């Protein structure tokens, strides 16, 4: 596979362009998304001629007009992954609100927040059945993927290796676990298992994130209990 993109396409100019409108008219198109289909189909043909298949972001299959030879990366939302698998596309499930590890983990921490603010507990909570994936759709799920985009890495000099570890661990551990065997045992059981790995990660030099302590207030006194 070669990933050819297709996300966040601004179709404003296509709607204004006389040449684009003429092309749509000649081909009986009414939706500008079909122009993206046309472009992607040409890309797919070039790849096929060289023995490759296209990987695309989920927006590229909005109309369902692309060949099912495409591999879809479902980043926008769980719904986008549901739509792609329902249309028969093999899909890498990676919705940002669960698996974009450049998202901040609490409102007070560093990172982006456009997709969600979440920690490893939310990652572990992802469940295909609860999200509505049918057995047929599950046959189109290639796997789960976590993502960390490079601009969030290079902007953190000089601490960027430590920052990458902090943002990815232990969220990536939770992702690996649910991709392997789901989350049927529940968070509390998994959390005990996860903390057993802390010494191992520390010995490996991984600068992982600890869960913040729990703070409560009652009758004029604060109580702080460590989560880790």
Segments predicted by a language model, with ranges:
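Active-site neighborhood of glycoside hydrolase catalytic domains
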Residues: 1-70, 75-87
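Flexible, acidic glycine-rich loops studded with aromatic residues
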Residues: 53-62, 66-70, 74-220
């Amino acid at each position: 596979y070669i990933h050819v993109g297709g996300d966040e396409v601004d179709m404003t100019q296509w709607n204004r362009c006389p040449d684009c409108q003429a092309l749509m008219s000649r081909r009986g198109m009414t939706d500008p998304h079909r122009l993206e289909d046309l472009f992607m189909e040409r890309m797919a043909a070039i790849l096929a001629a060289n023995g490759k298949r296209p990987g695309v972001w989920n927006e590229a299959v909005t109309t369902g007009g692309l060949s099912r030879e495409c591999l879809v990366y479902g980043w926008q939302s769980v719904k986008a992954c549901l739509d792609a698998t329902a249309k028969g596309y093999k899909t890498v499930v990676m919705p940002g609100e669960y698996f974009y590890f450049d998202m901040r983990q609490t409102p007070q921490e560093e990172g982006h927040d456009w997709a969600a603010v979440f920690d490893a507990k939310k990652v572990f909570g992802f469940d295909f059945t609860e999200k509505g994936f049918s057995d047929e759709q599950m046959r189109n799920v290639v796997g789960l993927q976590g993502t960390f985009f490079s601009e969030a890495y290079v902007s953190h000099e000089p601490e960027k290796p430590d920052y990458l570890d902090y943002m990815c661990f232990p969220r990536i551990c939770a992702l690996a676990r649910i991709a392997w065997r789901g989350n049927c045992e529940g968070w509390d059981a998994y959390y005990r298992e996860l903390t057993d790995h802390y010494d191992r990660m520390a010995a490996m030099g991984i600068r992982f994130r600890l869960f913040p302590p729990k703070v409560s207030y009652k009758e004029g006194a604060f109580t702080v209990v460590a989560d880790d």
